[in-house]
Amino acid sequence: GLLIVLPKKPKRSEILFHDKPKELQLWKRLSMPEELQRIRSMDEWFEKPAEFRNKFRSYVEKEFQRRRDGVWFYNNGVPTYITGRQYMFLQWSKIDIGYPSYLAFQREIFLHMAACEADPRCFGQLYTKCRRSGYTNICSAVLVDEASQVKEKLLGIQSKTGKDAQENIFMKKVVAIFRSYPFF
């Protein structure tokens, strides 16, 4: 077993879904304020009056904090940490079946990815996948997450052929996930 250090568990009141009964504690997407759902670009955001932007600034900043630091949520009474990348996957990455569900084995994939990224001795992640595990969607979401944070970063896609990478992964997965991201 690989030991991975998680962030310190916050106070109960700071863990998502702490106010729900144990049997109803499961991952559920958090709704965006209705006024923000209509905004499609940063240009539209900056055209809004300062009062409007100030009203929702804390929401946007909280989303960036969750993206950067990850988030804790209650899962059937168990405080569970997910990385920022998994948060972006679950909260904002619309895939071919809609938004993904939380799956515990995918949490392990995201935690291992984060450990690989944090360890300068690590050359990467080798994952022998089976079909229908969601790994292609996970990697597509990670690509969009990274590409949308770093200017002029070169990222790659690997598949059976270049054509398959372009048509089935980039066009059908990466572009769809990018389009589902919020304006911020």
Spans of model-derived segments:
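Phosphate/NTP-binding elements of NTP-utilizing enzymes
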Residues: 1-184
